[in-house]
Amino acid sequence: MVARWVKGSEDAPLALQKIPDLQSGPRSLRMEAIHIGMSSAPLVKHSNGVGLKAHRPRVMSKSGHSNVRIDKVDGIYLLYLQDLWTTVIDMKWRYKLTLFAATFVMTWFLFGVVYYAIAFIHGDLELGESNSNHTPCIMKVDSLTGAFLFSLESQTTIGYGVRSITEECPHAIFLLVAQLVITTLIEIFITGTFLAKIARPKKRAETIKFSHCAVISKQNGKLCLVIQVANMRKSLLIQCQLSGKLLQTHVTKEGERILLNQATVKFHVDSSSESPFLILPMTFYHVLDETSPLRDLTPQNLKEKEFELVVLLNATVESTSAVCQSRTSYIPEEIYWGFEFVPVVSLSKNGKYVADFSQFEQIRKSPDCTFYCADSEKQKLEEQYRQEDQRERELRSLLLQQSNV
């Protein structure tokens, strides 16, 4: 039996109840897999079966995009113009193409207007049969349309041969040279931004896949928070480093409330914590020991906590040597206690390693269930003591604030 958690239809704990009870012991435990539905919508949960309780908004989406809005910054447009290169590169393609097309058309038109003004001042627009000996500044430019076409042909180096500049007007020659220099610089800038945007390692980072959920299980006798990461391309990533930041509200001893307090969460692979070889989908572990910022998690309070775990993978692209970063985040509703990931890597009949990504998002109950189903009274007592200690700290902070006033 496979239970699928569909966003908005039922809560995750209800879906997990479809798995057989663990009280029968590890020997009779049936290894059932759960497929985690992908969704970027804010998660909600039932509060004592009455209504829905919304959780704190994400700082970072599952795809790694920041949800923080920058507002009320003095001179923000000037700051963007001062860093024009980054501003143009960060533009979306539709805005970039529109801006560059408008830039070319405007330069053609503006220089065409100046050419038309030169021809008007020189009297080239009033030529007739009686003025056949008059030499114009620009041949065949007797209207604004002709001036625009001359500007376009000169800037794009088309050179049809009908319209050409003469030696009669030195200022027209100077304007032609200025146009070619200015537009060449514009073309260099445009070409550079296009190449820089295409070659950005951002697209390479999108081929790094994180598991949609995280699990808490025992690894080598230690309680660990586990996530999966996979490289979707054959080209390798070198010098990989995975780290995490725990974001949660924190109240200092002075009573100051920090909305997004950051705590470092260290991950490791097997016995190594630096530069894992990410050639196959790998499992990263964070040990929930006394030094862990997640040490207070229990099966009872996991879904009641309000925090966000941001995971960052920094790596160097083998083919371009560019540094890329892939990000994701996990909230309590996406962390499952007492589960483990279904193995993804297997050995084929031909002796080759095969990564089956249809199993990448699936989890199953851990066979070692003693760490979360035994001694529940002790866990409840520890949780009660922890809540009393938290209330005592909040009371001391409140008294300290009143004394300062």
UniProtKB/Swiss-Prot annotation:
The UniProt entry's sequence similarity note says: Belongs to the inward rectifier-type potassium channel (TC 1.A.2.1) family. KCNJ15 subfamily.
Cytoplasmic compartment spans: 1-90, 196-405
- Native source species: Rattus norvegicus
Q: Where is this site: Role in the control of polyamine-mediated channel gating and in the blocking by intracellular magnesium?
A: 187
Subunit info here reads: Can form heteromultimeric channels with Kir5.1/KCNJ16. Interacts with PATJ.
Which is one Pfam family of this protein? IRK
Q: Name one GO cellular component term.
A: monoatomic ion channel complex
Q: Which reactions fall under this protein's catalytic activity?
A: K(+)(in) = K(+)(out)
Q: Which residues cross the membrane?
A: 91-117, 170-195
Q: What is its main location?
A: membrane
Motif mapping: Selectivity filter: 157-162
Q: Anything known on activity regulation?
A: Channel activity is regulated by variations of cytosolic pH; reversibly inhibited by acidic pH values. Inhibited by Ba(2+) and Cs(+) in a voltage-dependent manner.
Q: What is this protein called?
A: ATP-sensitive inward rectifier potassium channel 15
**GO term, biological process aspect, one:** regulation of monoatomic ion transmembrane transport
According to the UniProt entry, its GO molecular function terms are:
inward rectifier potassium channel activity; potassium channel activity
Topology relative to the lipid bilayer, per the entry, is: Multi-pass membrane protein
Which regions does the annotation call intramembrane?
144-160
* Keywords, sorted A to Z: Cell membrane, Ion channel, Ion transport, Membrane, Potassium, Potassium transport, Transmembrane, Transmembrane helix, Transport, Voltage-gated channel
- Quote the function comment for this protein: Inward rectifier potassium channels are characterized by a greater tendency to allow potassium to flow into the cell rather than out of it. Their voltage dependence is regulated by the concentration of extracellular potassium; as external potassium is raised, the voltage range of the channel opening shifts to more positive voltages. The inward rectification is mainly due to the blockage of outward current by internal magnesium.
Give the Extracellular compartment stretches of this protein: 118-143, 161-169
